[in-house]
């Protein structure tokens, strides 16, 4: 019990010494959420690009069976 009381006293002393600490935490929190949103968006775009590349490779290998002949581009 004495160690928990000491830590509570230390926390109270720190809060008395630094009154601007909770405001800093409140200001800092939305920036983290914005960065997490940016990272989540980047992950979603990455997944879409990777799946599109895999589907294109599958189509090229199994449906067209080999490299695309030039006769497809000349009508």
Swiss-Prot record:
Enumerate the transmembrane spans: 44-64
Return the GO cellular component terms, semicolon-separated: host cell membrane; membrane
Protein origin, superkingdom: Viruses
- Major place of residence: host cell
User: Where does this one sit in the cell?
Assistant: Host membrane
This protein's membrane topology, according to the annotation, is:
Single-pass membrane protein
Could you tell me the keywords of this UniProt record? Host membrane, Membrane, Transmembrane, Transmembrane helix
Q: What is the protein name stated in its UniProt record?
A: Uncharacterized protein ORF36
Q: Which organism is it from?
A: Ostreid herpesvirus 1 (isolate France)
Instruction: Provide the organism lineage as a comma list.
Output: Viruses, Duplodnaviria, Heunggongvirae, Peploviricota, Herviviricetes
């Amino acid at each position: 019990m004495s160690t928990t009381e000491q830590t509570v006293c230390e926390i109270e002393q720190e809060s008395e010494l630094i009154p601007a600490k909770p405001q800093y935490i409140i200001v800092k929190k939305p920036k983290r959420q914005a960065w997490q949103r940016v990272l989540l968006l980047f992950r979603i775009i990455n997944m879409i690009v990777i799946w599109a590349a895999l589907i294109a490779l599958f189509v090229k290998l199994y449906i067209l069976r080999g490299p695309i002949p030039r006769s497809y581009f000349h009508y």
